């Protein structure tokens, strides 16, 4: 609701809040310094628990980018963190074997059994949105197995049909033998 968002912005503009929330090390990545809250970019996310999307200007010299953190209250992020740690581990192992799937596992830090922080991955989208946008029928979007493949192809025009995992196609010139999965 616009009124709720404006009240949140009004609260965050108070000097005490700006001072407390500025010039911090990111709890998700201590090597990242969070300069100042970009109040106008902060919002509530459109989901049941209304997570708070907080955007910061990045204090890193010359980076000039923004850093986002989602604060969630009411969700248990401990399983999310474990899953993401397993994905990070698999990504490292795959890269050691020469397989770079270009993954960006985001940071997740439970701060309690029902609260926590999640790293915002800029210029990304959810699988649900991809399925909805790349499917012909919204009612069956979640069951459309081609939606994700069509999205991958639209983002990677150099990819061609060939051997791969399931029906996924891979870039030309990459050795993918031995990676096919049994269905």
What feature does the model see in each segment?
Residues 8-181:
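Conserved ATP-binding subdomain of kinase catalytic cores across diverse folds
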Residues 2-7:
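Eukaryotic intrinsically disordered, low-complexity, charge-rich
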